[in-house]
Amino acid sequence: MTPAADGDDDETTCIRALELIFTFVVPMTLKATIKLGLLDALTGGGHALTADELAAAAQLPAEAASSVDRMLRLLASLDVVKCAPTDTGGEAAVRRYTPAPVCRWFAGERSLAPLAMFLLDDDYLSTWNQLPAAVAGGDGQVAFEKARGMPMFEYMGTNRRLNTLFNQAMVQQSTVVIGKLLERFQGFDGVSVLVDVGGGTGATLEMITSRYKNITGVNFDLPHVIAQAPSLPGVKHIAGNMFESVPNGDAIFLKSMLHLHNDEDCIKILKKCHQALTHNGKVIAVEILLPAIPEPVPTAQNPFRMDMIMLNNHWGGKERTEPEFAKLAVECGYTGVFQATYIFANYWALEFSK
């Protein structure tokens, strides 16, 4: 039985404080269940499973069942999984588990599990210990750089294992967001040549050009990235540096690019895009928008969490409000309509018209 606080403000705030302190338990438990294959086993089971059955399905020793049960009952209390106790006739009830709706985001083809595995990896997560020193230092070094001695993307080139986790996380997250973009955004209508700046190996453009057969895709990234890009129908790969020049097109696509940079660098990027656009061209940027007011609701909390990730990872990187993006558009010479279209999970499509 869970005791009630009975209107005791002191107890209510203390419980809230403890909740914040113990928050780390949730993602670390989630990571363990993903790594052990428990959530895959649960979502693939087709029926309610006991901890013993889940342990067996995940090929864990029988002795692990008790620990499995303890992890899953925590997740049940958070509505990640569902729990239904079964009466055993006077003995301790046996809990049977089924996946809750949110569980599908941690298993299967559209899983966000790779994102969790990257963010909770020791080589990444431990960099957050340097956040106080980075904030107090005032020397332009973010926590990640203080911890690893070099900027994040440079470090990724030295840690193949972590880089693989990062790439898997970005591919899965982009697949989800771009899939929703293609369902809900009409801004690609009428586009002939679409340039994806920072497009990686072309996976995003492949999704877009598969839907819009009339679009010729130009995938633009650094030479070492383009060197790994596969041949794709309807997509041309070009190597270069966006701070120097951008290939010509009537639309330029920027997916989660601007939040990596400070305002000065964003202006440089957007001006190079402006120069490369046709007369009536536009930039389509997919970004998270910060709410104007930090309200205590998930739709506001998640953008502010992402902003903290930028603060930890990249010097000058940050999430922005819609007015801040509109201001950047004006400063870069985009005199046409600026508009924001909501896509999915805090992501927006921003159109900067020339």
Curated annotation (Swiss-Prot):
SUPFAM superfamilies given in the database record: S-adenosyl-L-methionine-dependent methyltransferases (SSF53335), Winged helix' DNA-binding domain (SSF46785)
Active-site residue list: H259 (proton acceptor), E287, E319
Keywords carried by this UniProt record: Methyltransferase, S-adenosyl-L-methionine, Transferase
An individual GO BP term: biosynthetic process
GO molecular function, a single term: protein dimerization activity
Binding, S-adenosyl-L-homocysteine: G198, D221, M242, K255
Origin: domain of life: Eukaryota
Family: Belongs to the class I-like SAM-binding methyltransferase superfamily. Cation-independent O-methyltransferase family. COMT subfamily.
Name assigned to this protein: Caffeate O-methyltransferase-like protein 2
Gene assigned in the entry: COMTL2
